């Protein structure tokens, strides 16, 4: 009776036990027509995102002066880089740690640059301090202290602005450092995705990443609540919504799907074990989502500057024309005298 029952059970695949990501050729060999079409469409969407960003970066570089153009280019690069790294991770599953490291670096810089853009759109640091110098800063905002309504309001001065900038700069610095440490420990087997035991470094690195992330988001939230009424005509609410959308999808969505993969909710389907299949699904979702974010960013940031640049170019041409007329008139007056 027992041998017959054993014959009816499906054979156990060792891939599900090792939980090791497959090589790229193993993925490609197991693709059906639907999988091939999906790979082609997602790769095409990634290429379109890259081309849209390059065109937008060229436009910003030519039309907008420094340092505003570099800040906006960095912000627009975030979604494109997440889509690109996700595409590489989809094609090469074993590169997930390295693609996640690259995406996290760009995300950290994106959050810091977005806060700098809020100050820059107010006219710079001096204009920002003169505009909001008499305003009290509300620090009981999400995601860190939204429930602590009893927190006092702070005066806005150079020290306050420096602390807010430090809140995002620490994330731009520490997040790449922590992810680099995770990659190094992963090669040694000390860092394992989904392993929450205290003996492994995974849980401690994840706690550090979580603290730095929440602190940076808190600083940006405080700054946004302060300037949003003054920057409504500059589409700042839409830009902030897209920024939040990018952060939530690249962080919260990824964490939830990875937890589902490590707990077995997303099951093993050879050649992909559970955690690798979860990363595989998340990468495909991120490509589609970041494609939409790239297109929306182009609309928001491009439309904002078209009319302004047109007026600036007209003013520059008028000033140049007036200067040339003045120089020509002066030359005609001075010519006979010099002779």
From Swiss-Prot:
Residues 54-70, 119-165, 224-254, 302-339 are cytoplasmic. One of its GO terms (cellular component) is plasma membrane. It holds the Pfam family Solute_trans_a. Residues 1-32, 92-97, 187-202, 276-283 are extracellular. It catalyses: taurocholate(out) = taurocholate(in); prostaglandin E2(out) = prostaglandin E2(in); estrone 3-sulfate(out) = estrone 3-sulfate(in); dehydroepiandrosterone 3-sulfate(out) = dehydroepiandrosterone 3-sulfate(in). One of its GO terms (biological process) is bile acid and bile salt transport. Keywords: Cell membrane, Endoplasmic reticulum, Glycoprotein, Lipid transport, Membrane, Transmembrane, Transmembrane helix, Transport. The chain crosses the membrane at residues 33-53, 71-91, 98-118, 166-186, 203-223, 255-275, 284-301. Its main location: membrane. It is a multi-pass membrane protein. InterPro entries: Ostalpha/TMEM184C. One of its GO terms (molecular function) is protein heterodimerization activity. The keyword Flavoprotein does not apply. The keyword Lipoprotein does not apply. It is found in: Cell membrane; Endoplasmic reticulum membrane. Glycans are attached at residues 6, 188, 195. Belongs to the OST-alpha family. Essential component of the Ost-alpha/Ost-beta complex, a heterodimer that acts as the intestinal basolateral transporter responsible for the translocation of bile acids (such as taurocholate), steroids (such as estrone sulfate), and eicosanoids (such as prostaglandin E2). Interacts with slc51b. The Ost-alpha/Ost-beta complex is a heterodimer composed of alpha (slc51a) and beta (slc51b) subunit. This is Organic solute transporter subunit alpha. It comes from Xenopus tropicalis. The gene is slc51a.
